[in-house]
Amino acid sequence: MKKSLKKILAFTMAAAMAAGLAACGSSASTSPSAGGSGSAPTVSDEPIKISMYYADNPTLPYMDSWLAVQETAKIAGVDLTVEAIPSTDYNTKVSLALNTGENCPDVILYQDTKGENSSLALNGAIVPISDYPEWTPNFNAMVEKLGLKDDVEELALKDGKRYFMPQLFDQPFYDGGLIMRQDYLEEKGFDAPKTFDDLYEILKAYKADHPDSYPLTTLVAPYVTYRMMMPSFGISFGKSSSSGTGALSYDYEKGEYFEGCISEEAREYLRFMNKLYAEGLLDPEMAAPIDGDVWSTKMATGAAMATYAYYDQIGGVETASEIDGFKLQMYPSLEGPAGAHHQPKSKTGKGIMFPASTAERDDFEQVVRAVDEMFFSEECSTIWCLGVEGTTYTMDGDKIVYSDDLTSSPDGIYKTMQVKYGCGADPFQFVWINEREMSKYDENYAQINKTVAGMEDGNVIQPLPPTPLFDDLTAEDAASLQTPLADSIEVWIDAFVTGSKSLDTDWDAYVAEMKNLQIEEFCKMYNDNLRK
């Protein structure tokens, strides 16, 4: 089935190219320049219809009326239909669509080719977009501008092709982490936490003062907390693991993968989380998805005093609270057994995929060109960040001056722009320029980022682990192993954290189950296929 998809894709891509050549003339067949320029095809006066999957976050629900969506679609000449899928179900829905080839949208946002998608790509379910650089001149130019050519080339799979257009960052930044009640720390004489022992002592004190509370609560789902905490323990596994496998972690010193989910590092992390749970310090309401309003209410009312979340959410919670002197602060990563680290990030992020079925459209080239303009052109990428000049901001020389409704908003500029205008909505914004982003935050945020940059020799935020260069058969084998491993791990994580399974008496059974599911073979596949 998958092999036939590959053949179908080859045929449809050839047909699409032929149609593009007929529309553009023979000049379209010439190799593009380094900047990726190419003559645009003749287009209709009518907007091009494009359907799209969008990963919807409950703390930032999608709206068709967002200014950024409306303006960029108009500029690119797109009649856009967005299917907003809850972020907790998103990967499952994408996997189903790509595996079956049924009811696929034209465009899938917020994806990469780690894990199962590698197999799907190599077996023909996803368009190798790097084959068509002349259709993505804006993407090419932005890659060149930000100096990310090598970073983007690293995303190629075993066949030398890249299957998505990634988010582009000039530099990663610390946008979320541990957020706590600063007013409580000041009242009780606590210093800012530096270690997980410090965190435990603060949570324990708050519980003693507020017996009905669960001091540490969770945003959206437990995986948000896990992915921000685990790197300080030297691991990243589970639903939002940095490797994209759910099971494996990456050893940055050795430059290789290891069975992170069954490591002693994992056991140590789970023991810490179980300790918090057993002592009533961790919110037991962890079933995903967690409503954003519920999370905000818990923080604002004092039912909780700590969370792992994002800086732009602080203003809204502070405004909602009726507690005198209520004040939140975000802190740099806490030091654990492996140092102080945050969830890994790279200068490229998840991006845009075109399912193979999109290549069957007669106007496939126009679809790609429209998407390229809507997300990567200078004009549109600026709108996704800043909004529309004259509406959300004006320019005073080189200085960005935000509108009064943004500067006076109790939720802060960044969050208000997200909620009201769709600017900075992660699945939609594909060009992130640090200096421009920092203009939306206050001096406190800039200072936090400066502090983080000076820790761990500038390595608090480690790069994402490398993607193995699987061939199509190995990618299929890896994908077939990954799913049962990842599913089982989620069950065991929950059991260990809540105490329904013991980290002492049940750990060996857990390890045995993972080995029966061939985690060692899975890890060997990854290491054997790393780029040399």
Question: What are the residue ranges of the model-derived segments?
Answer:
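Bacterial N-terminal signal peptides that target proteins for export
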Residues: M1-F11
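Extracytoplasmic/secretory soluble proteins
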Residues: F11-M13, M17-K532
